[in-house]
Amino acid sequence: MGKELLTFSDLSWLDSSPDSVRKAFTNSYGRTPDGISVNNETYFNAVKPAITEQYGHYCYKRTGQTKIVSQQLSDPTDAVLGSSIARNRGDSPVTLTVSVAGTWNDSTSWSTSAEAGVTMKSEFEVSGFFKTGAEFSVSVTAGKSGSSSVEKSSTSQIQVTVPPRSKVTVNMVGIMKKEKVCFEVPITVDGSFGANFGSSVQGHYFWFMSTDQALSKTSGIIKGTIDHASVFDVSTEIGPSEPL
C-alpha cells in the first residue's frame, strides 16, 4: 500500500482549498484562525514550525485495494517460435533427427491516469490474476507507464522422414494469448489539519480538525490498464515435404 504526506497542493483534487479549510475552522469555533497547517506546511499567518508537525498530527494519502474493473481476453493466435529444416539430397528416403529451438517473450506493460489531478508520487503495488490464470503484480506510479518482459525458450528433438531430394520444415509453435486488464485504485485521505488563533478559543490557541470535517471529500481514484501477452501450449509441427 502506498502512503505519503498530504500537501496543500493536493486540496484541489479534494474539491477544497486553504480558504475552505480555514472556513471549516471558522464554522466550528466561531472565529477565523490566523493560520492553518498540514504536516510540515503552513498557510496564511500560521505558527512555524507547523503545529501539525510539532504535535504529531499528521495527514496522509493512501492507496487502497485494487479493483479490477474489466478483463478482455483476445482471440488466441498461432505463433511460430522457431524452425529448423531437414534436407535430403539423396535418391532414397532418409530419417533424420532434427533439433528445433524456440524463443519468445512473456511481456507486460501498464499505464495509469489520475482522476481530476489526483497525485501520488510513491510507487504502489497492483496485483491480481489474469483470465489465463497467471498472477500479476506490478509496481506503478500515478500518471506514468512502464513495461517488463521475461524471455523464455524451449528446445526439442524430433525424427523426420524426408523423401528423396526434398526438405521438410519443423516448426516450434505456440498459442499467443493477449489480455487487457482495466483497474482502479482508490486514494483516501486521513489525519488532521491544524489552526492557530490570535486569542484563546475555548481555552486553547491551537486546534486540530480531522480531514472528514475539514475537506469537501477525502478520496480520489487512479485508473490504469495492464496489457499482457504470453505463449501457451508449445509444441512441434512437421510441415509437408518440398522439393529441393
UniProtKB/Swiss-Prot annotation:
Name used for this protein in its record: Hydralysin
Keyword Cell division: no
Coarse class of the protein's main subcellular location: secreted
UniProt source species: Hydra vulgaris (Hydra)
Compartment(s) of residence: Secreted
One MF annotation (Gene Ontology) recorded for this entry: toxin activity
Gene3D superfamilies: 2.60.40.3040, 2.60.40.4280, 3.10.290.50
Entry keywords, A to Z: Secreted, Toxin
Family, similarity comment: Belongs to the hydralysin family.
GO CC, any one term: extracellular region
Top-level taxon of origin: Eukaryota
